[in-house]
């Protein structure tokens, strides 16, 4: 499963509910992108969420 290395966001699971309160499983996927960033001074390709990219918490290589 892909997981953001900055914020830790990943796919979460839950129930989809109808008006009659019937339930079926569903999943919410985080908006993840595979980007190259500097990790320990070396370029590395990692999964990063769009929220982390927009906030400026990291710089692309």
Swiss-Prot record:
Cystine pairs annotated here are: none
Arranged from A to Z, the UniProt key words for this protein are: Ribonucleoprotein, Ribosomal protein
Q: Name one GO cellular component term.
A: ribonucleoprotein complex
Q: Name one GO biological process term.
A: translation
InterPro entries documented for this protein: Bacterial_rp_bL28, Ribosomal_bL28, Ribosomal_bL28/bL31-like_sf, Ribosomal_bL28_bact-type, Ribosomal_bL28_sf
Q: Name one Pfam family in it.
A: Ribosomal_L28
GO MF annotations, alphabetized: structural constituent of ribosome
Q: What protein family does this chain belong to?
A: Belongs to the bacterial ribosomal protein bL28 family.
This chain's protein is named Large ribosomal subunit protein bL28
Q: Which organism is it from?
A: Lacticaseibacillus paracasei (strain ATCC 334 / BCRC 17002 / CCUG 31169 / CIP 107868 / KCTC 3260 / NRRL B-441)
């Amino acid at each position: 499963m892909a997981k953001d290395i900055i914020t830790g966001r990943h796919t979460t699971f839950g129930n989809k509910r109808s008006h009659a309160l019937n339930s079926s499983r569903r999943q919410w996927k985080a908006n993840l992108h595979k980007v190259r960033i500097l990790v320990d001074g070396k370029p590395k390709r990692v999964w990063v969420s769009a929220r982390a990219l927009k906030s400026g918490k990291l710089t692309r290589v």
